[in-house]
UniProtKB/Swiss-Prot annotation:
Alphabetical GO biological process terms: bacterial-type flagellum organization; mRNA catabolic process; negative regulation of translational initiation; regulation of bacterial-type flagellum assembly; regulation of carbohydrate metabolic process
Keywords: Bacterial flagellum biogenesis, Cytoplasm, Repressor, RNA-binding, Translation regulation
Protein name: Translational regulator CsrA
InterPro entries for the chain: CsrA, CsrA_sf
UniProt-recorded Gene Ontology molecular function terms: mRNA 5'-UTR binding
CC terms in the record's Gene Ontology section: cytosol
Complex formation: Homodimer; the beta-strands of each monomer intercalate to form a hydrophobic core, while the alpha-helices form wings that extend away from the core.
Function statement: A translational regulator that binds mRNA to regulate translation initiation and/or mRNA stability. Usually binds in the 5'-UTR at or near the Shine-Dalgarno sequence preventing ribosome-binding, thus repressing translation. Its main target seems to be the major flagellin gene, while its function is anatagonized by FliW.
Family assignment from sequence similarity: Belongs to the CsrA/RsmA family.
Organism field: Clostridioides difficile (strain 630) (Peptoclostridium difficile)
Listed HAMAP family: CsrA
Length: 70
């Protein structure tokens, strides 16, 4: 994992077409602006993990229901 420091209005490029820019700093909160092509998904990790876990739970429930129908 690469760890770097950036100040307000400084940016990082990822590949040729993704830019992550620091647009604000307020105490422990950092506001980022991300520019990327439309085909690139940009997700907050905590939301992604929550949705993934809920999908796994739903799948497990569906498997149990299907097995009970045999």
């Amino acid at each position: 994992m690469l760890v770097i420091s950036r100040k307000k209005d400084e940016a990082v490029l990822i590949g040729d077409n993704i830019e992550v820019k620091v647009v604000g700093v307020d105490g422990n909160n950092i506001k980022l602006a991300i520019s990327a092509p439309n085909n690139i998904s940009i997700l907050r990790k905590e939301i992604y993990e929550k949705v993934k876990n809920e999908n796994i739970k739903a799948t497990n429930k569906n498997i149990k229901i299907l097995k009970s129908l045999k």
